[in-house]
Regions:
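Switch/connector loops and helix/strand junctions flanking conserved nucleotide-binding motifs
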Residues: 21-22, 47-56, 116-120, 185-186
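Short, glycine/charged-enriched secondary-structure capping and boundary segments
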Residues: 2-4, 25-28, 53-57, 123
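Conserved catalytic network of the ASCE P-loop NTPase/AAA+ motor domain
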Residues: 2-6, 29-35, 100-102, 141
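GTPase G-domain guanine-specificity segment
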Residues: 45-100
Length: 186
């Protein structure tokens, strides 16, 4: 919820073998409520039974090299995902069939493990970002304001904060103040 509440754009990663799960619905509701543009990464295509992986290859190149029954299996899994989104009121299709990206959510089949489809995922993300955020992306002067997503201890670095700065700038060695449970932390 924390990341979804401040995100300008999102990639919703779905395990193509499992389809929609409980957390998928939760994420979709957050994105819908915030009107956050997003695309869907249908991950783990390399785990579809019979899939022959071609590492770091665009999906559009590895897909035609698969046996027909494997392509049909993957298509059915993707259309199950598309159907679930359609029932929630979204216009959605596989990225290579989308005609109007402004009004249609794109599904990009990919594998984080083998790198297949990452090329198309980045292309769609860049296009979506340019389309939806062109007027919103700007640098503002002044003190940084942001949202802390996570606080953790990193070996060699010490205490680290993962944040999203949404206003102003933050410079190296600059003093920051974070709201703590009982009092501000400097």
């Amino acid at each position: 919820k924390r990341g979804g509440s401040v995100a300008d754009i999102a990639i919703l990663v779905i395990n193509v073998l499992r389809g929609f799960e409980a957390q998928t619905f939760e994420c979709v509701e957050i994105l819908k409520a915030r009107k956050t543009p997003f695309l869907v990464a249908a991950n783990m295509i390399d785990r579809v039974p019979g899939w022959n992986s071609y590492p770091d290859t665009p999906f559009s190149k590895s897909y035609p090299l698969q046996d027909p029954y494997v392509r049909e299996d993957l298509d059915n899994r993707i259309y199950d995902v598309i159907g679930a989104f359609s029932r929630l009121g979204f216009k959605i299709d596989r990225f290579d069939k989308v005609r109007e990206f402004a009004s249609t959510v794109a599904v990009v089949p990919m594998s984080a493990k083998t790198g297949e489809g990452i090329h198309e995922l980045l292309m769609v993300l860049i296009g979506l970002t340019q389309q939806h955020l062109k007027k919103r992306l700007q640098t503002t002067e002044g003190p940084a304001k942001g949202t802390v997503l996570e606080v953790k201890e990193d070996p060699g670095l010490g205490l680290t904060l993962n944040t999203i700065i949404y206003d102003g700038t933050l410079q190296k060695n600059e003093l920051i103040v974070v709201g703590g449970k009982e009092k501000p932390i400097v």
